[in-house]
């Protein structure tokens, strides 16, 4: 079961286009939130980790190809798939999850993690519906500060990851 706080990628694309045209922001369906995450509307450049001696990104690239990316990304030094292709790939991945019997629920923000005796027992969705579970993978993505606040307030252990700052010089 996948719970996505934002909209599906097609609805999200329309919401993003409307934002660029009118300035009307949909809080949970925009460049940051929705199916595919913040990277869906990036320029489609892929970090290949070509110098990684463990080849950890190879399977990710193969997965992109399996769902519609150009096979050239498997050997290009600086692969690029583009936002238009990435959106189709994200949708194809969702369709495969559904075909295999999985579930994807949009506009379903995890607002509480339910526990008993120190173990996860479920989640509360949109502060209303409860979904039982024994295991939980929480992937809040970019800009989900309210999710981190909820974790902090409920004393879930967290640790900061290394922080990197970069900049681009164009000439």
Model-derived regions, located:
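Residues forming the flavin
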Residues: 1-45, 49-171
């Amino acid at each position: 079961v996948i719970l996505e706080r934002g909209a599906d990628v097609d609805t999200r694309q329309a919401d993003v286009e409307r934002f660029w045209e009118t300035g009307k922001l949909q809080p949970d369906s925009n460049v940051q939130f929705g199916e595919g995450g913040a990277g869906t509307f990036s320029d489609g450049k892929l970090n290949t980790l070509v110098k990684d001696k463990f080849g950890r990104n190879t399977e990710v690239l193969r997965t992109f190809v399996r769902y519609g990316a150009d096979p050239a990304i498997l050997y290009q030094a600086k692969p690029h798939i583009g936002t238009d292709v990435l959106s189709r790939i994200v949708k194809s991945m969702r369709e495969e999850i559904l075909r295999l019997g999985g579930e994807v629920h949009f506009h379903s923000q995890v607002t509480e993690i339910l526990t008993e005796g120190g173990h996860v027992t479920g989640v509360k969705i949109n502060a209303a519906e409860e979904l039982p579970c024994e295991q939980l993978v929480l992937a809040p993505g970019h800009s989900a500060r309210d999710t981190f606040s909820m974790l902090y307030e409920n004393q879930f252990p967290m640790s900061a990851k290394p922080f990197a700052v970069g900049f681009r010089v164009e000439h």
